[in-house]
Amino acid sequence: MAVQQNKKSPSKRGMHRSHDALTNPPLAIEPTTGETHLRHHISPNGFYRGKKVIKTKNDD
């Protein structure tokens, strides 16, 4: 089992953890419906970049 040779200082510990922070997911607003969705994903209504790409249950 690996054991550290020297104790890591609080500064080095903080530097190691600097990339662990959580970030908000990148959201986009669909121009036709105004709904928010993940970037590069289809909105819940089936729109992508202003065009209808799939049929949903609510469609006639």
UniProtKB/Swiss-Prot annotation:
> Would you kindly state one Gene Ontology biological process term found in this protein's UniProt entry?
translation
Among Pfam families, the record links this protein to: Ribosomal_L32p
**Composition bias, Basic residues:** 49-60
A cellular-component GO term for this protein:
large ribosomal subunit
Q: Which UniProt keywords apply?
A: Ribonucleoprotein, Ribosomal protein
Alphabetized InterPro entries for the sequence: Ribosomal_bL32, Ribosomal_bL32_bact, Ribosomal_zn-bd
GO molecular function terms attached to this record: structural constituent of ribosome
Extract the signal peptide range: none
Q: Where is this region: Disordered?
A: 1-60
Protein family (similarity comment) = Belongs to the bacterial ribosomal protein bL32 family.
Record protein name field: Large ribosomal subunit protein bL32
